[in-house]
Curated annotation (Swiss-Prot):
GO terms for biological process: carbohydrate metabolic process; cell division; cell wall organization; peptidoglycan biosynthetic process; peptidoglycan turnover; regulation of cell shape. Substrate binds at D57, R65, R128, K158, H159. This is Beta-hexosaminidase. The gene is nagZ. Belongs to the glycosyl hydrolase 3 family. NagZ subfamily. Pathway: Cell wall biogenesis; peptidoglycan recycling. Plays a role in peptidoglycan recycling by cleaving the terminal beta-1,4-linked N-acetylglucosamine (GlcNAc) from peptide-linked peptidoglycan fragments, giving rise to free GlcNAc, anhydro-N-acetylmuramic acid and anhydro-N-acetylmuramic acid-linked peptides. It is found in: Cytoplasm. One of its GO terms (molecular function) is beta-N-acetylhexosaminidase activity. Its EC number is 3.2.1.52. InterPro entries: Beta_hexosaminidase_bac, Glyco_hydro_3_N, Glyco_hydro_3_N_sf, Glycoside_hydrolase_SF, NagZ_Beta-hexosaminidase. Keywords: Cell cycle, Cell division, Cell shape, Cell wall biogenesis/degradation, Cytoplasm, Glycosidase, Hydrolase, Peptidoglycan synthesis. The record marks D169 as: Important for catalytic activity. The active site is at H171 (proton donor/acceptor), D242 (nucleophile). It comes from Methylococcus capsulatus (strain ATCC 33009 / NCIMB 11132 / Bath).
Length: 334
C-alpha cells in the first residue's frame, strides 16, 4: 500500500498501481482538493486496478485528511472527556458519518479507531486516544466501530499492542517501552482483546520497541504478530504494517529488508508513505512473491460495502441529522 505525490496520478504512479505486488493506496491531504476531484481520482485508480484497496487516516481531530466538503469530526478524547456516557452515542454517530462520507467518494476504509490507552506522556497519540482507562477506550472505540460498520466500512484498530505508554514519536525515533508483557495484557491490550472478540477486521502494529518482551518491534516480530496476536488473542483479521518509511522502522534495515521482515513476521499488507523510492524498492523486492490465501481472504474483507451515492447521502435525513448532532457536540465541547 503506497501513497501519491499529488491530486492526480503521475506516470510512475500508474506504473506502481499496475505492479502485481501493489495491493492498496493510502491517501493524504495533498491528494485531496474536493469531493468531485476525489471521485475522479478513485475512478481512475479503479480503471487501472478494480481490486485496489483505498484507505486514509481519517480519525477526526488533528488526523482528518479531507476537510473541505467533509464534516469536521472531534478528536477521539472529546467523546468521554466532555460528554460522559452521552459521548458513546456521539462516537457512534461520528463513526457512521466518517465512514459514510468516505464511502461516498469511493474510499474503502479509514485506519481507525485508535485503541491506544492514553498515559499522558505521548504527544503523538494524546487526544487521538479515546481515554486513559482501557474500559473507556473499549467502550468508545466499540461505539465508533459500530458506526463505521453501519456505513459499510471495516475497522482497523491501532497501534498494537499500545503506543500510549511512550513519549517518543515513532515517525522520528524508535520509542522504547520497558513494561513487562503482564502489564500490557492488564491494560493496553484490553481494548484490542475486546474488539477482537467482536470480529475486528484489521489491526496496525506500533513501531515501538517493547524491550523487556522482544528484541524486535511488533511489525517485524513473529512473537507479537503470531504468538500473541494470532495464537493467544485469536485475531483472524488483516494486519497492516505501520508506515515502513518511519524512523521507528529503520531498525529492520533498508526498505526492502523492512518489507521482507514485516511479511515474514506476519503482516498481510505493507504500508509505505512519503518516499517514492521506497515504494519502488519494495515493489522490486516483492516481484516474485504472491500473497498467501489467508492474506488474500483477510484483505478482501477490508473492501468497502454498501457504496453510497454522494448526492443521495447529502440529501438523506440520516446524514443531516448526524451532521447536526456532531456540530452540536463540537459546540458543547468548546
Amino acid at each position: 500500500m503506497f501513497d501519491l505525490v499529488g491530486p492526480r496520478l503521475s506516470a510512475d504512479e500508474r506504473e506502481f498501481l499496475c505492479h502485481p505486488a501493489a495491493g492498496g493506496l493510502i491517501l493524504f491531504s495533498r491528494n485531496y482538493a474536493s469531493p468531485d476531484q476525489m471521485l475522479a481520482l478513485v475512478s481512475e485508480v479503479r480503471s487501472l486496478r478494480p481490486d485496489m484497496l483505498i484507505a486514509v487516516d481519517h480519525e477526526g481531530g488533528r488526523v482528518q485528511r479531507f476537510r473541505e466538503g467533509f464534516t469536521r469530526l472531534p478528536p477521539a478524547s472529546a467523546y468521554l472527556e466532555v460528554a460522559g456516557e452521552a459521548g458513546l452515542a456521539a462516537a457512534e454517530t461520528a463513526g457512521w458519518l466518517m465512514a459514510a462520507e468516505l464511502r461516498a467518494v469511493g474510499v474503502d476504509f479509514s485506519f481507525a479507531p485508535v485503541l491506544d490507552v492514553d498515559s499522558g506522556i505521548s504527544t503523538v497519540i494524546g487526544d487521538r486516544a479515546f481515554a486513559r482507562t482501557p474500559e473507556e477506550v473499549t467502550a468508545a472505540a466499540r461505539a465508533f466501530a459500530t458506526g463505521m460498520r453501519r456505513a459499510g466500512m471495516a475497522a482497523v484498530g491501532k497501534h498494537f499492542p499500545g503506543h500510549g505508554g511512550v513519549a517518543g514519536d515513532s515517525h522520528l525515533v524508535l520509542p522504547e517501552d520497558r513494561r513487562e508483557l503482564e502489564e500490557l495484557l492488564a491494560r493496553d491490550l484490553l481494548p484490542f482483546s475486546a474488539l477482537i472478540r467482536e470480529n475486528l477486521e484489521g489491526i496496525m502494529p506500533a513501531h515501538v520497541l517493547y524491550s523487556r518482551i522482544d528484541a524486535r518491534p511488533p511489525c517485524f516480530s513473529p512473537f507479537w504478530l503470531q504468538t500473541i496476536l494470532r495464537e493467544r488473542m485469536n485475531f483472524d483479521g488483516a494486519i497492516f504494517s505501520d508506515d515502513l518509511s518511519m524512523a521507528g522502522a529503520a531498525v529492520a534495515g533498508d526498505y526492502a529488508a523492512r518489507a521482507l521482515a514485516a511479511l515474514e513476521a506476519g503482516c498481510d499488507m505493507l504500508v509505505v508513505c512519503n518516499t517514492p523510492e521506497a515504494t519502488a524498492s519494495i515493489l522490486e523486492a516483492l516481484e516474485n512473491r504472491t500473497a498467501s490465501p489467508g492474506s488474500t481472504r483477510r484483505l478482501a474483507a477490508m473492501c468497502g460495502r454498501s457504496r453510497i451515492d454522494r448526492d443521495a447521502l447529502l440529501a438523506s435525513s440520516e446524514w443531516r441529522n448526524a451532521v447536526d448532532r456532531i456540530h452540536s457536540f463540537n459546540d458543547s465541547a468548546q
